[in-house]
Amino acid sequence: LPVFEAKDHFLFYPIQYEGQECSKNIFYSGAAPNQQAEPAVDWLLKNKGKDFFLVGSDYVYPRTANTIMKEQLKANGGKVVGEDYLPLGNTEVAPIIAKIKQALPKGGVIVNTLNGDSNVAFFKQMKAAGITPANGYSIMSFSIAEEEIAAIGPEYLEGTYAAWNFFQSLDTPASKTFTKAFKAKYGDKRVTNDPAE
């Protein structure tokens, strides 16, 4: 941020962000927590349970979003029973899986702000450990769309939830037009997602 302001250059920032800064040199088009995380937590509280485990990649967005969600949960009768972070790209998820099992032995809500390859290992190992919707776990992810589903494998995500501002499978005229134009330009096998929208 200081570099763009000092040089008076412009940055387009298309992914979700913390929402706690503003600059005339940055155009944020991604969701802030009040547009993604907070509505998802409201829905989870009303429909899925009160005991939450927060897991995320270890950088500013997951930590800030989780701080906001903890306050929201506290104010609305929810409870954080655990919280843990992985360095970006880390696939050593077994310790986190063990913590989830210990904190939520009979099921509960898991909010996932992991990114990248961490999600592949996370969902595969969660299924192997029996942490699935069929066993009473509601899992909400904030950085998973069609491309990530293909990388992880849909069989590992069945019954889980994702909250993002755009999915190419969204059944609206605008989504269909955008996705068709995107595929015409970049190829039919390419997948668009929230940041690309």
What are these regions (language model features)?
Residues 5, 45, 98-101, 150, ...:
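Alpha-helix boundary recognition
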Residues 126-197:
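Extracellular/periplasmic periplasmic-binding protein-like sensory domains
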Residues 18-19, 24-129, 169-177:
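Extracellular/periplasmic Venus flytrap/periplasmic-binding protein
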Residues 1-13, 19-21, 126-135, 155, ...:
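Extracytoplasmic "Venus flytrap"/periplasmic binding protein-like
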